[in-house]
Regions:
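Auxiliary N-terminal substrate/complex-recognition segments of SAM-dependent methyltransferases
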Residues: 4, 33, 296-297, 323
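Short amphipathic alpha-helical interaction segments
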Residues: 289-304
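Minor-groove-contacting beta-hairpin "wing" of winged helix-turn-helix DNA-binding domains
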Residues: 314-318
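C-terminal scaffold of the Radical SAM
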Residues: 1-9, 15-291
Length: 335
């Protein structure tokens, strides 16, 4: 990252940086010098009053030296891509680490002085049973991370997993099993003191992800790097995904990006698909009157069906609604 890129994207330096999230790929594979340069460049260009600086890491990249260096740079939160505590399932998704390394990474991070740790988990692997998933949750709880994000395994087009699915080499987990696993996730973590504050995110009291919460609450953000997105309430922009093209543009003093103007309907839909993911739901008083009325009309059937609830001018998903959140949000959208 170069200071020129930041200055070109936001030349007036009028924003104050509240959170920094270094992710999108695998930033822990960068050298310590590269990580230092990224963080120091942000601090040099923008006024920073950062409450949270997060770096994504793979467990096998974690060392005491790395954690000590990033802590001294101001990093106070690590998001660790554990995915599963099953060595067999880790091999299936071609991860380099094993379960023992994942547990050791959490201990190393804490010993090196960063106490705010989030771990990512996946469920819905081929042939994974409810007992297997419970074992993963139990292993995670033994480590007592401050935050847990959990998602069902996705077969994204263009990936090796998708190719295996298309060639009938694996069978996708059925919806009923995924639903049972999600229910187990909610019940197990809630019983162990974790707050379920967003569809896929759980935390101990006081440890919500500040950066992600800002995104879900329609806060403007700046994105740097190939394929990164930026948003300022009025426009959304995205950098070219091709790394060579992106680097070439930056070295020439240009930004390889496109943008779109956000009209009122699109902004309303954006609020629905982000705020509705949170336990607070959509604050209807944030909406213009015509959109507030539209939301209430559109929500009636799902309120009657027990998928949504209306309380204190907030429209939010019920527990039943969490299982079909995409459908419920689609019912509320304009575009």
């Amino acid at each position: 990252m170069r200071s020129g890129e930041l200055k070109a994207l936001y030349p007036d330096h009028e924003c104050t940086i509240d959170t920094v999230y270094i992710g999108g790929g695998t930033p822990s594979t960068l050298s310590i010098d590269d990580l230092s340069r990224i963080i120091n460049t942000i601090k040099a260009v923008f006024p920073c009053k950062t409450r949270e600086i997060t770096i994504e890491m793979n467990p096998d990249d974690v060392t005491t030296e790395l954690i000590s260096v990033v802590r001294n740079l101001g990093v106070n939160r690590i998001s660790l891509g554990v995915q599963t505590f099953s060595d067999e399932r880790l091999r299936f998704i071609r991860r380099r680490h094993n379960a023992a390394q994942a547990a050791k990474a959490v201990e190393t991070i804490r010993r090196a002085g960063i106490d705010n740790i989030s771990i990512d988990l996946m469920f819905g692997f081929p042939h994974e049973t409810l007992n297997d998933w419970q074992n993963d949750l139990d292993a995670a709880l033994k480590l007592r991370p401050n935050h847990i994000s959990a998602y069902s395994l996705m077969y994204e087009e263009g990936t090796p997993l998708y190719l295996m699915l298309q060639n009938d080499k694996v069978q996708q987990t059925d919806d009923d099993t995924c639903l049972a696993m999600y229910t187990m996730l909610m019940d197990t973590l809630s019983a162990n003191g974790y707050e379920h504050y967003e569809i896929s995110n759980f935390c101990l009291p006081g440890y919500r992800a500040i950066h992600n919460s800002s995104y879900w609450n329609d806060t403007p953000y700046l994105g740097f790097g190939a394929a990164a997105h930026s948003y300022n309430l009025l426009t959304r922009s995205w950098n070219v995904a091709d790394i060579k093209e992106y680097v070439s543009a930056i070295e020439s003093g240009n930004l390889a990006s496109e943008s779109e103007r956000i009209d009122d309907d699109t902004h309303y839909d954006d609020i629905i698909t982000t705020a509705m993911r949170t336990c607070e739901g959509v604050d209807l008083m944030r909406l213009k009157p015509e959109y507030r009325n539209y939301a209430l009309r559109s929500a009636k059937n799902d309120i009657d069906g027990g998928l949504l609830e209306l309380a204190d001018n907030h429209l939010r998903l019920t527990r039943k609604g969490l299982f079909v959140s995409d459908m419920v949000m689609s019912n509320l959208m304009k575009v």
